Amino acid sequence: MTRAKTAFEDALARTAAAVETMLDGLLGRESLAGELERPVRLLEAMRYAVLGGGKRLRPFLLIETARLFGAEGIGAVRAGAAFEMVHGYSLVHDDLPAMDDDDLRRGRPTVHRAYDQATAILVGDALLTLAFDVMADPATDVSA
């Protein structure tokens, strides 16, 4: 393995861990306490959809691009997590019976198989909406 490949893989792993931690926090019950009451099942299904899988390449590219422009820090990680929520939304909806009708995603049952179709639709919609909320939050502002 070359030194450059190892450095890239290390950077990707660090970013993946940071984004995973951010997603865990953004989708945690504590962070949503001030929001409208979300059904526990919906929150669990949202977490199922985006946590515990994937290389996090999209947020890595976003965060590294932000770094090139001097926009580092928590705001960039929040934006990366929001980007991953949008990606999660697209996968959940793509897996639905009306689309690809996939049974597995990343080696485990898709959201509509693990829960049900109605929950999967709501999960995708909620992830997309939450991503917009995260991006609009002043805490995501990388210019500060």
Q: Locations of the language-model features?
A:
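N-terminal amphipathic/basic leader segments beginning at the initiator methionine
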Residues: 1-30
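Mg2+-dependent prenyl diphosphate-binding active-site environment of isoprenoid biosynthetic enzymes
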Residues: 24, 36-144
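Short, N-terminal intrinsically disordered low-complexity segments that are rich in Pro/Gly
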Residues: 5-13, 32-36, 50-51, 121
